[in-house]
């Protein structure tokens, strides 16, 4: 088994390196690819020094079985044929192919079997906020069909990349030293001591691209007709996203039923005890694999409504871990 990482020097690429090692991913060889800027960079993996190769239109992928790609939608579109033409399976972390009818969009806890039907040799990894939500929705859907979803996300700076994290830290430093923020490049407004109710660009319907991803991707992954309305907000934490989720189901689900289903579901950890002020928070979920769920309660305005809070590391389960789990599923089912 020969595996590649495309975009090895990025935040998600680095997480791929850590996870492939941590999970003892079965492979004989790992090959790293990157842009001209990162080509030549060296990383250590399982005691061996690996050098990032320049991603080019050549036959480098001829003997590679699985490629984890995380170098942006433009790169994925440009190099998809080069990567897949000899049979390599491309597990893509970008938005390039997510809504293509002939590309499965997969979260293993929900629709792992979809990964086996890949006409173009490409499997798409969903958006981080979508992944985190559907992992929790699936066990509830198994009890009663979800008709409607409303979600507000609280997304950390790292969701916009490593440079965005650095900018947030720089903004705090500037506020302490001078009392004003001078560095605003990665966000539309100052993020320090602030929240920004915009992630990605606005669409003609008034929603942002990020919000429409949650609507479209949730329906595709879960094979559902559920309506989903999202508001995505950037907050001034560094890592891990959180979401406040409300659902309406065909039949009522009790709090106890929901808690039991979530606690038993793969990829979920229930953290829900108001008597001890115990609930998920970004500072406690960073670096962890599961999605943590709490504040489970009945909606006071709808007997078929349920609401809950979740938090999880969007770089792990929201990106690299989900892709690695897809790869593991393919190996088990080849």
Q: What do the PLM-derived regions correspond to, one by one?
A:
Residues 1-191, 227, 291-292, 296-302, ...:
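N-terminal Rossmann-like NAD(P) cofactor-binding subdomain of oxidoreductases
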């Amino acid at each position: 088994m020969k595996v590649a990482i495309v975009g090895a020097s990025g935040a998600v690429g680095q997480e791929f390196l850590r996870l492939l090692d941590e999970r003892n991913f079965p492979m004989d060889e790992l090959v790293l690819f990157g842009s001209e800027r990162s080509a030549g960079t060296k990383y250590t993996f399982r005691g061996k020094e690996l050098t990032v190769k320049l991603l080019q239109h050549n036959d480098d992928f001829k003997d590679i079985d699985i490629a984890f790609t995380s170098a942006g939608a433009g790169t994925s579109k440009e190099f998809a044929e080069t990567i897949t033409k000899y049979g390599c399976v491309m597990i893509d972390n970008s938005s390039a192919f997510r809504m293509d009818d002939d590309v499965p969009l997969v979260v293993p806890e929900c629709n792992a079997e979809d990964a086996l039907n890949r006409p173009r040799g490409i499997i798409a990894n969903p958006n981080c906020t979508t992944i985190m939500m559907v992992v929790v929705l699936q066990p509830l859907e198994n009890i009663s069909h979800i008709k409607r979803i409303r979600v507000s996300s609280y997304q950390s700076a790292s969701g916009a990349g490593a440079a965005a994290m650095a900018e947030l830290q720089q903004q705090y430093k500037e506020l302490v030293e001078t009392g004003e923020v001078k560095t605003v490049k990665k966000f539309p407004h100052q993020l320090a001591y602030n929240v920004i109710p915009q992630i990605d660009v606005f669409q003609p319907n008034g929603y942002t691209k990020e919000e429409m991803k949650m609507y479209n991707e949730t329906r595709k992954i879960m094979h559902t007709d559920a309506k989903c309305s999202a508001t995505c907000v950037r907050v001034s934490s560094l890592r891990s996203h959180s979401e406040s989720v409300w659902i309406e189901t065909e039949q009522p689900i009790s709090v106890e039923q929901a808690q039991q289903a979530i606690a038993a579901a793969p990829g979920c950890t229930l953290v829900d005890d108001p008597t001890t002020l115990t609930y998920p928070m970004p500072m406690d979920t960073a670096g962890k694999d599961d999605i943590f769920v709490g504040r489970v309660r009945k909606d006071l305005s709808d007997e078929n409504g349920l609401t809950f809070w979740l938090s999880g590391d969007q770089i792990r389960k929201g990106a690299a871990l989900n892709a690695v789990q897809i790869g593991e599923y393919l190996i088990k089912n080849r």
